[in-house]
Amino acid sequence: MSILNEPQGASAAEDSYENELPVRRKQPGNVVIKWLTTTDHKTIGTMYLVTSFAFFVIGGVMALFMRAELARPGLQIMSNEQFNQAFTMHGTIMLLMFATPLFAGFANWIMPLQIGAPDVAFPRLNMFAYWLYLFGSTIAVGGFLTPQGAADFGWFAYSPLSDAVHSPGIGGDLWIMGLAFSGFGTILGSVNFITTIICMRAPGMTMFRMPIFTWNVLLTGVLVLLAFPVLAAALFALEADRKFGAHIFDSSNGGALLWQHLFWFFGHPEVYIIALPFFGIVSEIIPVFSRKPIFGYMGLIGATIAIAGLSVTVWAHHMYVTGGVLLPFFSFMTFLIAVPTGVKFFNWIGTMWKGSLSFETPMLWSTGFLITFLFGGLTGVILASPPLDFHVSDSYFVVAHFHYVVFGTVVFAMFAGFHFWWPKFTGKMLDERLGKITFWTLFVGFHGTFLVQHWLGAEGMPRRYADYLAADGFTALNTISTISSFLLGMSILPFFYNIWKTAKYGKKIEVDDPWGYGRSLEWATSCPPPRHNFLTLPRIRSESPAFDLHHPEISAIDQLENVGHGEKALAGGKEAGK
């Protein structure tokens, strides 16, 4: 990578010697060896994205089995034991094997490009973190291969359900140690991200010129270092209980509540660990398709810092009904965390306001995220109130809220990010028509599945039950939810077809920025980038270096306006001094 220089755009990559060589078909064995031994952050990012998406499909299939079971009263296709394993592993897979490593995938791919770094700070540690995640997750899911099946005590493993008496199978032990393994990978990855952002920014890339996505990766990394060691310690203590009779989480000495405190001190920051990076993705996409810089850049960063700080003060709102927590404090802090989240909404809507909007597929997914996450946030404010929470705790109202928040953030923003950065990943654009078909089928299927679950919960249907009576009156809404869930599941098919069609027939991108209005630094290098990302780096004078590079006439006007404002302020100061 050269020192600062005025780049030649996409032609710089085309002029390189590598691009003059004849294109050869890679041997499958060479590809496998490359993936097994790589330390390139882009390849590792791709591995994270592919693996996490595979777990997304596996977790989704489990969800469809559960919805098929609940379509009608009576046991249809699963026993109670199988249903317990399904909801335990569905939650575990979606949160810790899909959403968390998906953040690592996007961060690995995009963050070094956005700060002008040639790679991450510790490439081999990066590779090690991925393999810890993969093998840890495989160990946890491997419980399905054991005689008594996988873990069946719910994904938050409440004591005493998770002790050796109530869950004697080896599936529980595999779940505990697999998640500890995988968690170490997440911790090591976050150390890498934080070090890279602090130490490896390009010349001119000050902290307050960093893209919002990079800021969110930094704060997410800090949250991981606060939350995941607590989970690892709690998991080892639980395994000591199960194997060595340590009696740490015995109900007789308050251990059941101790587990809840330890788990939720991890669990609530975890929700923001999987939310903040995807907020960052949306914050990158909306300005590009609004043809405007982000509204309130500093305020958006401040709101993100506030969310990260407050996220470690609200864990016991999961424990209102235990009677063992200070309700006024945790209720107030939970209401309070809605404020910076609301600030973010004003930033996003303010960016779109009076912008030159165009609804290409990434923008469509981002708009779907705004609508869905807003619904989830509103039901979160309801659950923050202890009297209302007492009524709907452990009901389908909580299930609906959680899916609106997590699915609405992670999955909608994931597809937005895929469609937005696919040219950067592969050098080809995903098909717009197929992308819109995927969006509308998923959007309708999702809301049909989970909107009605709010009413089911308010009417009293408990979560995690495999069966209900016809006399309960839950049948109609459950049937609607199940039909919609299969529409939601089918929405993945056009996306897979889109990937295949693009790979086989898509045209090669010849420019650095195929969207035309990209602002951050990844749009100032070729699609896909060279091994160390940049052949030349543009000068970084603002938080939109790629836009300044490709639209110098607009950046020149902005600089003149800034100089004019500065001169007026200076003159005003002199007058005040007189």
Curated annotation (Swiss-Prot):
Binding site for heme a3: H401
Biological pathway: Energy metabolism; oxidative phosphorylation
Region (Disordered): 1-21
GO CC entries: plasma membrane
Signal sequence, renumbered to the chain: none
Bilayer topology annotation: Multi-pass membrane protein
GO MF term set: cytochrome-c oxidase activity; heme binding; metal ion binding
UniProt: Fe(II)-heme a binding residues: H90, H403
UniProt: Cu cation binding residues: H268, Y272, H317, H318
EC top class, as a word: translocase
Segments passing through the bilayer: 44-64, 93-113, 125-145, 174-194, 217-237, 262-282, 294-314, 319-339, 363-383, 402-422, 437-457, 480-500
Cross-referenced Gene3D superfamilies: Cytochrome c oxidase-like, subunit I domain
EC number annotated for this UniProt entry: 7.1.1.9
Subcellular location: Cell membrane
One Pfam family, short name: COX1
PROSITE patterns named in the record: COX1, COX1_CUB
Reactions the enzyme catalyzes: 4 Fe(II)-[cytochrome c] + O2 + 8 H(+)(in) = 4 Fe(III)-[cytochrome c] + 2 H2O + 4 H(+)(out)
UniProt entry keywords in alphabetical sequence: Cell membrane, Copper, Electron transport, Heme, Iron, Membrane, Metal-binding, Respiratory chain, Translocase, Transmembrane, Transmembrane helix, Transport
Cofactor(s) required for function per UniProt: Cu(2+); heme
InterPro entries reported in the protein's UniProt record: Cyt_c_oxase-like_su1_dom, Cyt_c_oxase-like_su1_sf, Cyt_C_Oxase_1, Cyt_c_Oxase_su1_BS, Cyt_c_oxidase_su1_bac
CDD domains in alphabetical order: Ubiquinol_Oxidase_I (cd01662)
Free-text comment on the cofactor: Binds 1 copper B ion per subunit. Binds 2 heme groups per subunit.
Function text: Cytochrome c oxidase is the component of the respiratory chain that catalyzes the reduction of oxygen to water. Subunits 1-3 form the functional core of the enzyme complex. CO I is the catalytic subunit of the enzyme. Electrons originating in cytochrome c are transferred via the copper A center of subunit 2 and heme A of subunit 1 to the bimetallic center formed by heme A3 and copper B.
Assembly and binders: Associates with subunits II, III and IV to form cytochrome c oxidase.
Family: Belongs to the heme-copper respiratory oxidase family.
Protein name according to UniProt: Probable cytochrome c oxidase subunit 1-alpha
Native source organism of the sequence: Streptomyces coelicolor (strain ATCC BAA-471 / A3(2) / M145)
Gene giving rise to this polypeptide: ctaD1
